[in-house]
């Protein structure tokens, strides 16, 4: 094992080491603004570290049908897990456009996952999620509008990384729905917003490439915009405080 994490279970080591990469990446990005592709490569590196330590989606099950046979992902385990971790990390990062929004959504997701785990008989995992939720709630006191402390890329990427990796070292098949289903439901808004942003920017890049050339089009894919769901709701409601209810 790695010296600072000696004696800790291997999957937990992977999450901790991956978190270090995510936090350092976010801190550097907050200070000097990394290129989007550099940030993506480092996010993938963090996910690979977690995967190499056993944080992997190996099977898919149907929680509504106890008799249904579990589907082994086999060779697809690694790419599916990589997509899940990097996708969730970016989902929280992209949704962090207003005071308290990413923190509030992470809080809701953690409470939802902790509650689901409690009802299927995982008290220790429940405690982990409720501690995580408690830290989000304490931070939200200072992050809610008007915020005095901000997540930055460091905090938002870390929240997404932890929420995506924590459930994945539970081994039993009956917990898999909690591992993927509950996070996807609780994080539905940022996941949908991320998918929409990728589609929107890709379409704009194609149109830009036709008008101004390939280099300009490629830049547009990585370029931030103000067309996220929370920006659209804010333009309609004017007040940040009013917009939290429909978003969360």
What label would you give each PLM region?
Residues 1-10, 28-34, 51-67:
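Transmembrane alpha-helix boundary signature
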Residues 1-4, 8-24, 101-248:
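Alpha-helical transmembrane segments
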Residues 10-45, 50:
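Hydrophobic alpha-helical hairpins/lids featuring a short glycine-rich hinge
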Residues 13, 71-81, 126:
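Membrane-interfacial loop-to-helix junctions in multi-pass transporters
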Residues 16-20, 41-45, 76-83, 155-159:
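Membrane-embedded alpha-helical segments of multi-pass membrane proteins
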Residues 29, 67, 90, 221-229:
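Juxtamembrane loop-helix boundary motifs flanking transmembrane segments in multi-pass membrane proteins
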Residues 76-92, 101-102:
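Function-critical hydrophobic alpha-helical transmembrane segments in multi-pass membrane proteins
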């Amino acid at each position: 094992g790695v010296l600072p994490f000696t004696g800790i279970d291997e999957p937990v080591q992977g999450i901790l080491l991956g978190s270090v990469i995510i936090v350092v990446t976010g801190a550097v990005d907050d200070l000097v603004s990394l290129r989007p592709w550099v940030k993506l490569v480092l996010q993938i590196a963090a996910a690979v570290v977690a995967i190499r330590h056993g944080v992997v989606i190996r099977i898919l099950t149907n929680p509504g049908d106890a008799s249904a046979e579990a589907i082994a992902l086999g060779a697809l385990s690694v790419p599916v897990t990589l997509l899940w971790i990097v996708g969730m990390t970016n989902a929280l990062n992209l949704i962090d456009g207003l005071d308290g929004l990413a923190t509030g959504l992470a809080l809701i997701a953690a409470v939802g996952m902790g509650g689901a785990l409690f009802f299927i008989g995982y008290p220790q995992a429940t405690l982990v999620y409720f501690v995580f939720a408690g830290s989000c709630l304490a931070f939200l006191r200072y992050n809610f509008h008007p915020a005095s402390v901000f997540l930055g890329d460091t905090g938002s990427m870390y929240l997404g990384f932890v929420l995506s990796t924590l459930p994945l070292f539970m081994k039993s098949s009956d917990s898999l729905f909690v591992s993927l289903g509950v996070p996807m439901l609780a994080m539905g808004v940022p996941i949908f917003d991320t998918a929409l942003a990728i589609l929107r920017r890709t379409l704009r890049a194609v149109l830009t490439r036709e008008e101004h050339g390939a280099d300009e089009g490629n830049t547009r894919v990585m370029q931030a915009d103000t067309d996220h769901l929370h920006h659209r709701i804010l333009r309609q409601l004017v007040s940040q405080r009013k917009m939290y209810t429909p978003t969360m």
